[in-house]
Amino acid sequence: MDKKKHGSHAGAHHTDEPAAETVAPAAEGAPAAADRVKELEEALAAKEAEAAANWDKFVRERADLENYRKRTQKEKEELLKYGNESLIVEILPVVDNMERALDHSDDDSASAVIEGVRMTLNMLLSTLKKFGVTVVEAEKGTPFDPAVHQAMCQVENTDVPANSVVEIFQKGYLLNERLIRPAMVSVSK
């Protein structure tokens, strides 16, 4: 019985030892596997954050590119619309001199020359109109508008309301609705 007791004890004892050995390696491997999973999860989170940052950067760059395209298209349109401005500004004094010549001429003297100047002026104004040049509205009695008129002086005048154009010294011009030269006028007090 002793042997049985010892044998059954020995068998029970012998069976417990391998089980403890089997559990021990699993217990040692579990922290290593958990650490590895944690490392992989952290690496995945970092890559996902990097991918999100790259996507945001891509979206911003695409929006910047679209804004650049729109801006360059607008600049191109502006250039086409107002590219002749410096040429037209240089031509306007010629128009002024022709108008002055007609204003100070006698209808009796040299009517053929006067008619030639008148025709030339009309052709020049017609050509300017084709390119979008229009005259600023500035007739006697027109309300003074500092956006398109330049006041050269103020005068007493009861014929027109206060702060109105009395006399036009030089016509103003618009190029496609942009002021390129204000009308020089006298204004009533």
From Swiss-Prot:
List the GO molecular function terms: adenyl-nucleotide exchange factor activity; protein homodimerization activity; protein-folding chaperone binding; unfolded protein binding
So which domain of life are we looking at? Bacteria
Q: Which Pfam families match?
A: GrpE
Q: Where is the composition biased (Low complexity)?
A: 20-34
Please name the InterPro entries in this protein's record: GrpE, GrpE_coiled_coil, GrpE_head
Show the SUPFAM superfamilies listed in the entry: Coiled-coil domain of nucleotide exchange factor GrpE, Head domain of nucleotide exchange factor GrpE
Question: Does the keyword Nucleotide-binding feature in the UniProt annotation?
Answer: no
Q: Name one GO biological process term.
A: protein folding
Look up the record and report any one GO term of the cellular component aspect: cytosol
Q: Enumerate composition-biased segments (Basic residues).
A: 1-12
Its main localization is cytoplasm
Compartments it resides in:
Cytoplasm
Which residues does the annotated region (Disordered) include?
1-36
Q: How does it assemble?
A: Homodimer.
Q: Which NCBIfam families match?
A: PRK14140.1, PRK14150.1, PRK14158.1
Q: Which family does it belong to?
A: Belongs to the GrpE family.
Biological function: Participates actively in the response to hyperosmotic and heat shock by preventing the aggregation of stress-denatured proteins, in association with DnaK and GrpE. It is the nucleotide exchange factor for DnaK and may function as a thermosensor. Unfolded proteins bind initially to DnaJ; upon interaction with the DnaJ-bound protein, DnaK hydrolyzes its bound ATP, resulting in the formation of a stable complex. GrpE releases ADP from DnaK; ATP binding to DnaK triggers the release of the substrate protein, thus completing the reaction cycle.
What is the protein name given in its UniProt record?
Protein GrpE
